[in-house]
């Protein structure tokens, strides 16, 4: 049974990108998922993940089924394994946006239908695929260098893995103590060694961004870290992606953000709404990338 829990589960990244492009260009009109149902479990609120999966499944002929934590018996103590086995009797695929990555791994271990990680505390593979689709269409390939500025979080983890897989150099500019997970760094480093790319973690954002082709940031206070908000806002202040920082990047550099954004914190309105920004194309590509993922996992190919 194929699942997408991590970027490392994509043994066909370029094929998926090509498929996503085909969906974006309207080359695939057949209802690949006609008669199928996708369960969408959300332990965290969502705009882009929910809407893109729901619209994408519908456009592919499937019936999306939204399930919040309060809709399921998980909140009342039903084991994850029991939920996985039960849903597998009803639906053809499960997309889950969860708090704990280990819960998603357990769910996939017991499910008899494909499970898609729609975001956990460790990874966000769907976002990473859409990001690479965006980079390829804007830059023409992966010869440039991506710099992630801010918290070494789940989005950063998936970007490290997918850029390494595609042979793209990536730097992470973050405060001491907010580096990416050591296990993810080690895994990405091994992949990078095989593909000839380079990964660095740097604490000086100016040094990291100088000459970069892609500058990427994310919120400083992710869901679940609200109690650290005051400390984080102070620690990350020097890591704001503003025009002064963007001017250090390559002249044709693009600015990316997985959204939602807090203008005035991790970036400024001048940047996110300015000429370098591709965030709306990036958000749109969530739809096309996730169609490719559903096609791959649920399309009987």
UniProtKB/Swiss-Prot annotation:
Alphabetical keyword list: Amino-acid biosynthesis, Arginine biosynthesis, Cytoplasm, Transferase
Top EC class, one word: transferase
Entry keyword annotation includes Coiled coil: no
Record localization: Cytoplasm
Primary localization class, coarse: cytoplasm
Binding positions (L-ornithine): 154, 218, 222-223
Pfam families per the UniProt record, alphabetical: OTCace, OTCace_N
Known pathway: Amino-acid biosynthesis; L-arginine biosynthesis; L-arginine from L-ornithine and carbamoyl phosphate: step 1/3
Residues given in the record as carbamoyl phosphate binding sites: 46-49, 73, 97, 124-127, 258-259, 286
An annotated GO cellular component: cytoplasm
Family indicated by similarity: Belongs to the aspartate/ornithine carbamoyltransferase superfamily. OTCase family.
Physiological role: Reversibly catalyzes the transfer of the carbamoyl group from carbamoyl phosphate (CP) to the N(epsilon) atom of ornithine (ORN) to produce L-citrulline.
This protein's name: Ornithine carbamoyltransferase
Origin species: Methanothermobacter thermautotrophicus (strain ATCC 29096 / DSM 1053 / JCM 10044 / NBRC 100330 / Delta H)
């Amino acid at each position: 049974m194929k699942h997408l829990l991590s970027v490392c589960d994509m043994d066909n990244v370029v094929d998926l990108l090509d498929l996503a492009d085909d969906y974006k260009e309207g080359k695939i009109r057949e209802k690949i998922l006609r008669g199928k149902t996708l369960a969408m479990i959300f332990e965290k609120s969502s705009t882009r993940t929910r809407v893109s999966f729901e619209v994408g499944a519908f456009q592919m002929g499937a019936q999306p089924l939204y399930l919040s934590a309060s809709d399921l018996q998980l909140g009342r103590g039903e084991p994850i394994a029991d939920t996985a086995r039960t849903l597998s009797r009803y639906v053809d695929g499960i997309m889950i946006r969860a708090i704990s990555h280990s819960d998603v791994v357990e769910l996939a271990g017991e499910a008899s239908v494909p499970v898609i990680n729609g975001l956990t505390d460790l990874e966000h593979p769907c976002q990473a695929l859409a990001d690479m689709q965006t980079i390829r269409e804007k830059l023409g390939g992966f010869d440039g260098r991506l710099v992630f500025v801010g918290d070494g979080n789940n989005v950063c983890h998936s970007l490290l893995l997918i850029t390494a897989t595609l042979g793209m150099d990536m730097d992470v500019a973050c405060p001491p103590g907010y580096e990416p997970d050591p296990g993810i760094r080690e895994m990405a480093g091994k992949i990078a060694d095989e593909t000839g790319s380079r990964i660095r973690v740097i604490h000086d954002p100016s040094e990291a961004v100088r000459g970069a082709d892609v500058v990427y940031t994310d919120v400083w206070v992710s869901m679940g870290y609200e109690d650290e908000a005051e400390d984080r806002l102070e620690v990350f202040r020097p890591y704001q992606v503003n025009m002064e920082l963007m001017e250090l990047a390559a002249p044709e550099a693009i600015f990316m953000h997985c959204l939602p954004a807090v203008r005035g914190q991790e970036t400024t309105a001048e940047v996110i709404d300015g000429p370098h920004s591709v965030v709306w194309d990036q958000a749109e590509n969530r739809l096309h990338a996730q169609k490719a993922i559903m096609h791959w996992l649920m399309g009987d190919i």
